[in-house]
Structure formats: C-alpha cells, structure tokens
C-alpha cells in the first residue's frame, strides 16, 4: 500500500546579516508546525432542553434553492467578476532592508546628495527668509477695555441671534476675499490688518490668512462684530460686502 506524503513549500525571507543556515532551517520548521489545540468540553445547557421540543421554532420554512438556480448564480458571478490570476505574494517588495546591497548603497548615496542639495538651497535663501517671514496668525492681547464707539447691534443681527440662540460673546469671523480688496493684494491687506491688531484697534480680534483659499479670516466676539466690520472696511479700503460666518450656522450677516 503506497503511503501519501504531503509536501509544504515554504518561502523564507531573511535579512542579509541573518544568513545562518541552521537558524533559518529552525525558523522554517517552527513555522510549519501545527498549532497546539485543546478539545473543547461538551456543552451542557443550564436550561431544560429537549431535542424533540425546541423552545423557538421559525414560522416559515427556510427557502429552497434548486440546483439550476445555484448554477445560474455561479455563472453570473463568473461573468460579472473579473478573473484574478493567482500570484505569489511577496511581502518584502519595496522594503529597503531586503534589497540587495548595491541598491541600498545607491539609495543612501542619492538620499545624502539630495539632503546636501536641500541644505545648500536653504542656506542660500536663509537671508531672504529672515527678511520676509510670512505670518499665518495674528493675535491681539487680552484687554478688558472696550471702545466707546461700539454701538448696539442692528435689529437684523439681533433677530438672527435670537433665531439661532447665539450669545453675544459667541465667536464669529469676517471673511475677506480678493474680490473686496479694491485693487490691493491679499498680502497688502494682511500687512495692514496686522498693524491694526498690534495697535489694539480691533477689540477681541485674532486673524489668520488662508493663502491656499485666497481669504483672510478675522475672528471676533459677536457683540463687537459690526464695529469690527465697519472698521475693517474703512481702514483697509474694502469694497463690496463682507460676510460674517459662525461655525455650524454658516453666514448669518453681511455688510
């Protein structure tokens, strides 16, 4: 009687410095060993159980699928799903430590040259960057002083606050876009705005420039928003309408 033997193919990836044949063979043997299993104890229900009388019975019988229907489903799946060719999976692709030493050395050299080039470029432009450093945020100092020129909020804005149940200390933001800059660049507006904030002329304000969006956001308390909006339009020579935006509510006011 012929005995059947089942062979198992093992592909072992190892690092260049882990090339001991004995250790590699031992690792491969440990991998293909069967995991130890423990037989589960027989389940004994803690409730009265009778196989002939099930406590729960379905109202309807399970659906019966004929062989013809099953075959048609198989054909449909074979047509609709593209055939996937079986290919060996190599988990070491694109991993640098498993690459040949020649490729590794070339990568290290090219990476070093790139870093040196970038460092030289940064040193060359360091003087320019120190002269013109782009700021993204401008924050005013905390001050309890409130300008006397702040008038009560307009009826339209008060009605919006009552409808949305917003407090007068809720934060809002004015959105300044290029369309209201009146032939000025966004950077010019940003420079002028920073001066106003540093001089504490805009109460409770902080601002940020979103260069990728082409916008400047000026945050303030709602109680000061109309005063801030009028001051922005006057001191920055803005034209058109600017929108007051509140998080989760969108634009609630324009002027």
Curated annotation (Swiss-Prot):
DNA damage in keyword set: yes
Q: Where in the cell is it found?
A: Chromosome
- Return the annotated region ranges for Sufficient for interaction with MAD2L2: 33-88
Tell me the keywords, alphabetical order. Answer: Chromosome, DNA damage, DNA repair
Under the heading InterPro entries, the entry gives: Shieldin_RINN1
Name this protein carries in UniProt = Shieldin complex subunit 3
Give the span(s) annotated as Disordered: 116-135
- Where is this protein chiefly located? nucleus
- What is one GO biological process annotated to this record? DNA repair
This protein's source sits in the domain of life called: Eukaryota
**Any keyword DNA damage?**
yes
Gene name linked to the record: Shld3
GO CC annotation, single: site of double-strand break
Subunit structure and binding partners: Component of the shieldin complex, consisting of SHLD1, SHLD2, SHLD3 and MAD2L2/REV7. Within the complex, SHLD2 forms a scaffold which interacts with a SHLD3-MAD2L2 subcomplex via its N-terminus, and with SHLD1 via its C-terminus. Interacts with ASTE1.
General function of this protein: Component of the shieldin complex, which plays an important role in repair of DNA double-stranded breaks (DSBs). During G1 and S phase of the cell cycle, the complex functions downstream of TP53BP1 to promote non-homologous end joining (NHEJ) and suppress DNA end resection. Mediates various NHEJ-dependent processes including immunoglobulin class-switch recombination, and fusion of unprotected telomeres.
């Amino acid at each position: 009687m012929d005995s059947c033997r089942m062979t198992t193919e093992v592909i072992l990836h190892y690092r260049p410095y882990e090339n001991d044949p004995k250790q590699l063979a031992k690792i491969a043997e440990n991998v293909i060993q069967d995991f130890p299993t423990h037989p589960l104890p027989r389940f004994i229900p803690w409730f009265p159980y009778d196989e002939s009388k099930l406590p729960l019975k379905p109202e309807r019988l399970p659906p019966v699928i004929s062989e013809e229907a099953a075959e048609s489903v198989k054909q449909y799946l074979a047509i609709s799903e593209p055939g996937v060719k079986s290919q060996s999976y190599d988990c070491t692709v694109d991993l640098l430590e498993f690459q040949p030493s020649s490729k590794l050395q070339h990568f290290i050299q090219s990476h070093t040259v790139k870093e040196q080039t970038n460092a030289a470029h940064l040193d060359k432009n360091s003087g320019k960057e120190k002269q013109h450093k782009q700021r993204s945020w401008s924050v005013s100092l905390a001050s309890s002083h409130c300008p006397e020129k702040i008038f009560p909020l307009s009826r339209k804005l008060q009605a919006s606050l009552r409808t949305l149940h917003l407090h007068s200390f809720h934060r809002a933001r004015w959105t300044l876009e290029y369309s209201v800059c009146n032939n000025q660049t966004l950077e010019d507006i940003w420079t002028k705005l920073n001066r106003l904030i540093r001089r504490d002329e805009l109460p409770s304000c902080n601002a940020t420039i979103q260069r990728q969006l082409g916008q400047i956001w000026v945050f303030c308390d709602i109680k000061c928003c109309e005063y801030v909006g009028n001051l922005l339009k006057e001191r920055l020579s803005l034209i058109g309408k600017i929108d007051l935006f509140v998080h989760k509510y969108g634009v609630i006011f324009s002027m």
